[in-house]
Amino acid sequence: DTFAAMALPSLPPDRSVLSEPPRDPNSHIVDRRMMRRIVATGLLFFLFLAALWQYMFHMPIESVSEMFTADSVKVFFADIFKPKTTLHLSGYEMGIYFSIFVLMQFWNLFNVKYFRTHHSLIGDIIDLFRNPERVKASYNKYFLLIAAVIIVGQVIIVTFAGSLFNVEPISAEDWGLIILLTSPVLIIPDLYRFISGLRSKQR
């Protein structure tokens, strides 16, 4: 969160703001729509991470792929509320859990970046070939650098500083699966933004 809070203010101003009507000086900076988004996102993250935590205490995990086997899913729904659990998570399990948490926050960084901008990451990737100047104007090197630091820093922490965080290094395969598992945090909202942007242009 600290690095994300540093990355977002580094973004250049959006010129489209000049086309919007002035904000009511008596209105709150965090309006109802923004508050609903914050609460909904926080609640979804909490429920997912709480369920994952409970699941790991009932089912020993040695790789991310084990979480999606038929037996694992059966255990999740059959034993999730039973009091019998392991005494603690292993260092490898903690590494998986910690990395999932950080990657979810990383993807959400882009959701915050595109909030109320009428743009999307998918649209920006397409515009890299059609209108690269617009895309470059919406980013800067500091944002990209901090985003890279978050990812590289997480890999370094889990791989080389595990004893400080009670985690163990995880495999390259598990890193790939964690990226895929957490990417819907960005992909689903971004698809909605992209489709909404196309519809608004057609009006």
Functional labels for PLM-detected ranges:
Residues 2-203:
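C-terminal transmembrane helices and immediately adjacent loops/tails
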